[in-house]
């Protein structure tokens, strides 16, 4: 064992002694090239950011408002808005609040639409929320994820005094939808890279929680199933 250890130790020493001297000039040259390339790439980020911001600010949406849809299947739009609550949506390019009724009850639709998402005006933001946590009248009671035929949504119960609402919320980024803000950010990057689209939306449906949760959820699902395809087409056209 001593012999074997000595053999490897001697062999390594011989290898080190016989190894060619490193070409420090070549290494310095390559290091300089890599450093210059890295600095060039890094320097492009502010320029890219500036261009994206400039394009966002210079590109005005063709629509001055989100078009109103008079009915989704059996759900008819009220000519007079009857809102009792609104989500907090920070600096959307366009905003819509409408109330729809059927023999099942009433549903409020809210959309905050961002034609060109940019710093301070984007669908996924801590400024966009269902209630004001700092002294607002409405409070979040509970939240859970609910499956639909298209994609899961975030279901939240909010309350004020003796009144409660059941709210469904999700994001639309380009033509991709999710309730998750993390996945929505990924979708935003994906749409920017592969389709050049920068539009996004913060969407909620709400209904009074006067009876049991199952009945209120059934109303939301009925409206959702009859409205989602038309809403998607509407927002897709706005994002062109």
What kind of region is each of these model predictions?
Residues 96-239:
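A cross-kingdom signal targeting lumenal/periplasmic-facing segments of multi-pass membrane
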Residues 1-4:
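Membrane-interface transmembrane-helix boundary segments in multi-pass integral membrane proteins
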């Amino acid at each position: 064992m001593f012999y074997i250890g000595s053999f490897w130790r001697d062999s390594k020493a011989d290898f080190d002694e016989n190894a060619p001297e490193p070409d420090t000039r070549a290494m310095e040259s390559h290091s300089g090239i890599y450093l210059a390339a890295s600095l060039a790439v890094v320097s492009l980020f502010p320029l890219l950011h500036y261009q994206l911001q400039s394009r966002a600010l210079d590109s005005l949406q063709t629509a001055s408002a989100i078009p109103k849809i008079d009915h989704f299947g059996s759900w008819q739009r009220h000519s007079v808005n009857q809102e009792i609550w609104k989500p907090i949506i920070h600096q959307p390019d366009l905003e819509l609040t409408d109330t729809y009724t059927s023999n099942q009850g009433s549903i409020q639709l809210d959309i905050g639409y961002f034609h060109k998402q940019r710093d301070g005006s984007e669908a996924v933001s801590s400024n966009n929320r269902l209630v004001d946590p700092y002294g607002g009248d409405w409070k979040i009671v509970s939240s859970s994820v609910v499956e639909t035929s298209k994609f899961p949504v975030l279901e939240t119960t909010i309350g004020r005094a003796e009144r409660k609402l059941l709210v469904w919320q999700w994001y639309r980024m380009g033509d991709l939808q999710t309730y998750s803000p993390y996945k929505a950010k990924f979708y935003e990057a994906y749409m920017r890279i592969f389709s050049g689209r920068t539009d996004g939306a913060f969407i909620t449906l709400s209904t009074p929680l006067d009876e049991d949760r199952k009945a209120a959820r059934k109303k939301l699902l009925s409206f959702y199933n009859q409205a989602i395809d038309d809403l998607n087409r509407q927002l897709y056209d706005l994002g062109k």
